[in-house]
Each structure stands twice: as C-alpha cells, then as structure tokens.
Amino acid sequence: MVILAYRCLSSARDFEPAHRRASGLGFAEAQRRGWLARRASGRTLEWSTYPGHYQMRVWDEAYRRRWIERVLEATAGTPFDGIMADNDVFDDYYGLDLRSLAPDDAAAPHDLAGLRAALGDFVDDVGRSLTDEGLLLVPNIAEARREAGRWERHAAWGGGFDECWLGWGDKALFDEETALAQAPQLDGPGLCIVRTPSGGVG
C-alpha cells in the first residue's frame, strides 16, 4: 500500500491551523512573506468557488523553495510515501482573472499558459526534492488530455492523479472522444489514480 499526504500547490487557507494544514505553507507565513497573489488594487485573490482559499504566487522561486522545505519537514519521520499535490491546474477554475494581477509583480503570468508554465516548473522542483528524499510526488494533473505530453511530464516523479476521470460529475459525463483521450494516462509513468463519477454523494 502507498500512503500519500495531501498538500495544495496553489493556495493557502485562512481557516487552517498552521500546525495542521492541507496547504504547503500556513496562511500567516504566506501573508507575512508576501507570497499571496494580489490584484492591481492590492487585494488578495480569494478563490471564487472555495472561500478562504487564497491564490499563492506559484511563480515566485522563494515561495516554491519554502513550500518544499515545509512539506519535507512535515513529512519527515512519518509513514507517508510521498505527496499528492493538488491544484496543478490547467484552466481558471477559481476566478483568478490573471490579467488583473498587480503590475508591480514582474514575474506574474498574465495568461493561463504562463500559469501552467510556472506550475510545471514548480512540479519539477518539488519532484526533484522529494525524489532526493526517497519520496513520491503525485500531482492532481488537471485536464492533461488537453495538452500533449502534459501527463507524462507532470507524472514523472511518481505518478499522477485525475479527479475528473470520464466526467465532471454524475450529470456531466464526457463524450467518447474525450474519454478516450484520457486512456493513455493509465499507462503511467508511475502510479495512476483516477476518480470517476460515483452515482452517489461525496
């Protein structure tokens, strides 16, 4: 059995205790160090569909280094075999509107291609560091079917997770072409974890 710890790549959550969190970093530390993404108005980016989740500056190398440090600290000496890293996003699911990011954040992406590139670099940074410690990285690789080679690249450090396998939900199943485009993910590399519409709740 492989046991993975959940950590979010892309958000910090203001309702989580710093010592027991799903985010890589606690909210207070992220805020203090200036790693919360901001709009031109100076407001932080709270996810529209998940209150209390705030977009992190995943394009900031200092944030990425600290995220890795914190996750390795939290994982050391535990039974976990690695990390399931959530929100390796492909599209804007959370009302980010990247064009509105603060203009003085020179490294900030202003389109989704730029955000995907930043997350790709982040996944590689995390993967190398976890591999050095004998740990797996299994990102939740959103919509890998939409970009050739995306699954293979992001799953290279231990495997991949697709939480929308064969459909968005019970009332939004994929057509045959879309479902078949997901099929190669079953061949790896590494672990392949998929979540299908269940017909139930939860």
Protein language model regions, located:
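Glycan-processing catalytic domains of CAZymes
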Residues: M1-G202
